[in-house]
A protein has these predicted regions:
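N-terminal flexible segment immediately upstream of the FAD-binding catalytic core
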Residues: 1-81, 91-123, 152, 270, ...
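C-terminal substrate-binding/cap subdomain adjacent to the FAD-binding core in PCMH-type
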Residues: 54, 164, 172-175, 182-393, ...
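N-terminal glycine-rich flavin-associated loop
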Residues: 54-86, 104, 108-151, 163, ...
């Protein structure tokens, strides 16, 4: 290795491209049509694509977001005219650095995601490269078919990316890698040649040569290359289930049908651009069982793999106790982990069949046979939702290896080597001995059934000594893998992490063959240059282009929040995002609503995190809190906090947005509506000054259309929206008027009169007070005006927000110190005291106690009044929508359980965010996105509900979205549980 290692982001000579402005002009001239945002060369757009899920960072020349194949062809021609390198990109979740480069990035994921056809009889589907895997699988499952490879990123990885990477996943054991499931490809070469490739018979080969031209030259060159190197390919290519390293030259061997499409799979965009793909589908067993075996350690679990494979499972995965310990520290899959059998390492063995009886027989026979497997401790069988929950433990693995509290950062860099399954135990023992030499450690998880185990290690990339140790380690680890007949990459590809190690695995002759193959397809070396294979052998080394390298220092700006879990550094917090892209899923969960609506990288949690990191580093983007590009990206963040729970590394973009806006508005004045919405508690309190009268006066302008329209216009409120009207009397006013006496010997709870339920929906608080009384509690209701300050965060009023919380800590000190439960009905208000309170006061004992004592009604009943008898709703269907903060900061299980105790059938919608999100949905510029999100699941479900169905949601914003878009009224959980009561409350 060189004496002086390349330093972070040091550009190479061939990266220099001086015609970016001219290229942008040519692309804009060429790519016309209804979408006007196909060409993006601004700094913000480029910053979004500087990295993927790897350790690497390179600044692209620009970004193209094509509508269709014609756009791709035209854009490549424009790039070719100026010699600009290009890089095709799908979901951007690659782990080896193959989807970041100093090139023009083509993002296929926004528009080119069509499923052109699916023929269940022929078991084939034709798709565009940007389609997400889960969409293909969902369509195929209607016919009991599937696309076999299913990486853990299946909810957001694209088929184009899978083809480029040769992706695998759990069920590659059942149906093979991506390369084994490609029928044909339509591809575009850098020189403009467009062709369809697949298996090639002798007659087809002769016909191609007869036609002549570039395609004939290409095929003739490939045939000659194979004729020269066939014997060496047969000798050196490992015969294992998981060889992903190198080019798939073995697919061009005569015995494999000279399959050109499959030879291109795994080429990481270095040879051609995929325009469409025809996929082979396989039978998907409709009935499945999961058998989980416990072992004393991961090594003996690996030893058991050959014996288990004799039973022909369709999936065989492994996890170890270190991974589970990390999950415990991060509070991941807590209930699911308790379902595992005894042991310190576990194998997840899945079987499939056509009927339940058949698969049960297979699973129970295997469990009986497993008693004879050495060191197997216990075996549990799971089906249905229980099996799905166990699989979620496995799919949480990557998130459990990064940013683990109390542990050093773990990085990719040696995370997916594969060996013959029979030698997996030997490999792991030898590898861990090598790791101990270097002081490295890692959890283990992955595809044990195919000899591929994933890990992330505590590499030191921030010093040259650390880099030298890293390079020495991977050199020796590669030697170990090769000695066992394995592959340096068994799933994630070579990219930049492993490209320099390929000569160890393939030898000089095959490396020359790879370079010849590269020159045949890309003689000008313009396709993802420097990654995997270079025609001139100028590949990037694993120690170049590191996002965090020697001399790196996390930015340390002064902030309002403490960022305590990130050592007090906002800069380190923004490094949390490791690019796995869970925020880019579109069909389930709540994260990330703005991405679901726009499919724009800048509107994903990942995109925003990367922009904030770039801004704080001050390299590509100015280190300036006034950065309009960053503000624009944050503008569509609904502050739903879904990322806090659904992001594998717990990015809290709502808090990051509030922090940014606090600094931004130190230099830019607030808008008038910021004061209206942000300080809504004060306006509501003022409107209630004279009970009954002042509320009517405050509502009056909203009832006169010309005045209401003028107010909306001035404040930038969407004309389609109706501003909520104040209730005639607040809950506090009603409570004080009753002047009720409560027994002194009863346990007490403090019922928080939040702004929304107090001033707008007092009936919810009334119902809650009645529930508490019936449950045997004396109710404390603050007499003074109180507010958690939730709306202040939406506009960056963080100094004021801190003061609100400090006031609560002071004024309610006796109740906090006595351990009194603080009961909230509005999830977004409760989340302030669970979340932001500790972000401001992380070491304040009283703040910690208040956070622990803050409960939603359902939680309170579960903890303190489990014998409460709710109102009964037999033969009724309840449609439940969870507020985003309820799901992110608390959970829905308690509420579900209590609603079921009413005798009703309860359906919890997987609707994500309702789209209203406090003031967001009222703002004119956000109305369209708000409606798109509402219409995704929630509003259609409300309209489809029967008149007798009860609609339940605890969020004021959610109820407003329903009320303003349907004729239905949603109820608060408290209203549903509260039995009919007399009008007065004791």
């Amino acid at each position: 290795m060189a004496e002086s290692l390349p330093i972070l982001n040091q550009p190479r000579r061939h990266e220099r491209f001086d015609a970016a402005r001219e290229l942008e002009t040519r692309l804009r001239t060429t790519l016309r049509g209804p979408n006007h945002d196909k060409v993006r060369f601004d700094a913000t757009s480029r910053a979004l694509y500087t990295t993927d899920s790897s350790n690497y960072r390179q600044i692209p020349i620009g970004v193209v977001v094509p509508d269709d194949a014609d756009d791709v062809i035209a854009a490549v021609a424009a790039c070719r005219s100026l010699g600009a390198p290009i890089l095709a990109r799908g979901g951007g979740t690659s782990l080896a650095g193959q989807t970041c480069n100093a090139a023009v990035v083509f993002d296929f994921s926004k528009h080119m995601r069509r499923l052109h056809s699916l023929d269940p009889d022929a078991r084939v589907a034709t798709v565009e490269p940007g389609i997400v895997l889960d969409r293909v699988r969902e369509a195929a499952e209607l016919h009991n078919l599937t696309f076999a490879p299913d990486p853990a990123t299946h909810s957001r990885c694209t088929l184009g990316g899978m083809i480029g990477n040769n992706s695998c996943g759990t069920h590659a054991l059942m149906g093979g890698k991506t390369v084994d499931n490609i029928r044909s490809l339509e591809v575009l070469l850098y020189d403009g040649t467009r062709l369809s490739v697949g298996a090639t018979s002798d007659d087809e080969f002769r016909a191609i040569l007869h036609r002549g031209g570039r395609v004939a030259q290409l095929y003739q060159g490939m045939r000659q290359l194979i004729d020269r190197h066939a014997d060496e390919i047969r000798r050196r290519f490992p015969r294992i289930p998981r060889r992903v390293s190198g080019y798939n030259l073995d697919e061009l061997l005569p015995e494999n049908g000279f399959h050109v499409a499959r030879a291109l799979v795994g080429s990481e965009g270095t040879l051609a651009t995929v325009l469409s793909a025809t996929l082979d589908l396989v039978h998907s067993p409709p009935c499945r069982r999961l058998v989980v075996l416990g072992f004393p350690d991961a090594f003996v679990a690996a030893d058991a793999v050959p014996a288990i494979l004799e039973h022909h499972p369709i999936g065989l995965e492994g996890i170890d106790s270190t991974l589970l310990e990390n999950m415990h520290r991060k509070h991941l899959a807590e209930a699911e982990r308790k379902m595992l059998p005894a042991g310190n390492a576990f194998l997840l063995v899945e079987f499939g069949a056509s009927t339940d009886a058949e698969v049960d027989a297979i699973a129970y026979a295997f469990r009986a046979a497993a008693r004879s497997i050495p060191h197997a401790l216990e075996a549990n069988i799971f089906a249905g939702e229980d099996a799905a929950r166990i699989w979620r433990v496995r799919e949480s693995a990557l998130g459990a290896t990064v940013f683990v509290p109390g542990k050093p950062h773990l990085w990719e860099g040696w995370e997916d080597a594969a060996v013959p399954p029979a030698r997996l135990g030997e490999y792991l023992r030898s590898l861990f001995a090598l790791m101990r030499e270097y002081g490295y450690h890692s959890p283990l998880y992955g595809h044990y059934g195919q000899g591929c185990v994933h890990m992330r290690m505590n590499f030191d990339f921030e010093s040259e000594a650390g880099l030298r140790a890293y390079r020495s380690f991977i050199d020796r680890a590669a030697d170990l893998v090769v000695s066992l007949g394995g592959s340096i990459s068994g799933e994630h590809g070579d990219g930049q992490s492993r490209a320099a190690l390929l000569p160890k695995m393939f030898g000089a002759e095959l490396m020359q063959a790879f370079r010849e193959f590269k020159r045949l397809w890309d003689p000008d070396n313009r396709m993802n240059p420097g990654k995997l294979i270079s025609a001139e052998d100028e590949i990037y080394q694993p120690t170049e282009n590191l996002r965090v390298g020697p001399g790196y220092h996390a930015a340390q700006p002064e902030t309002h929040f403490s960022f305590d879990r990130d050592h007090g550094s906002f800069g380190e917090a923004t490094l949390r995002c490791v690019g796995v892209g869970a925020c880019r899923k579109t069909d389930s969960g709540s994260m990330c609503p703005s991405y679901m609506a726009t499919r724009e990288e800048q509107h994903s949690t990942r995109g925003r995190a990367h922009l904030l990191w770039e801004m704080l580093q001050g390299n590509l983007l100015d280190r300036d809190w006034s950065n309009e590009g960053v503000k624009h990206a944050l503008d569509l963040c609904l502050s739903c906090k879904a990322c806090k729970s659904e992001c594998p590394v717990s990015v809290d973009m709502a808090s990051w947005k509030a922090e940014f806006l606090a600094h931004y508005h130190q230099q830019h004045p607030h808008e008038l509506r910021h004061y209206l919405f942000g300080f809504m508690d004060r306006w509501a309190h003022l409107a209630a000054a004279v009970p009954g009268l002042s509320q009517r006066l405050a509502n009056l302008p909203l009832q006169i259309p010309p005045i209401s329209a003028t107010i909306k216009s001035i404040l930038g409120i969407a004309p389609q929206r109706n501003l909520p009207r104040f209730a005639p009397r607040t809950f506090q006013q009603q409570w004080r008027a009753q002047n009720a006496t409560q027994a002194a010997n009863l346990p007490q709870a403090l019922l928080w009169p939040d702004t929304w339920n107090n001033y707008y929906h007092p009936q919810s608080l009334t119902a809650a007070s009645q529930i508490l009384h019936t449950a045997g509690y004396a109710v404390q209701v603050p007499r003074q005006h109180v507010c958690c300050g939730r709306p202040l965060y939406d506009f960056g009023f963080l100094d004021t927000a801190r003061n609100y919380l400090r006031r609560i800590l002071t004024e309610f000190a006796p109740q906090i110190d006595s351990g009194l439960p603080f009961l909230f009905l509005e999830p977004s208000c409760a989340s302030v005291l669970r979340n932001e309170l500790l972000d401001f006061f992380p070491r304040d004992d009283r703040a910690r106690r208040l956070a622990d004592q803050t409960l939603l009604l359902s939680q309170f009943l579960t903890r303190h009044a489990p014998h409460y008898e709710p109102a009964q709703h037999p033969d009724t269907r309840i449609v439940l929508h969870g507020h985003c903060h309820h799901k992110a900061v608390f959970n829905m299980e308690d509420e579900l359980a209590w609603l079921r105790r009413t005798g009703a059938t309860v359906e919890l919608l997987d609707a994500g965010c309702c789209g209203m999100a406090g003031p967001f949905g009222f703002e004119r510029e956000h109305y369209s996105v708000s409606q798109t999100l509402g219409e995704r699941v929630l509003l259609p479900a409300v309209r489809a509900a029967a008149p007798a169905d009860i609609l339940v949601t605890d969020g004021f914003s959610c109820r407003e979205q329903i009320a303003q878009n349907t004729p239905r009224r949603a109820m608060h959980f408290a209203e549903v549980l509260c039995p009919p009561q007399p009008t007065s409350t004791p």
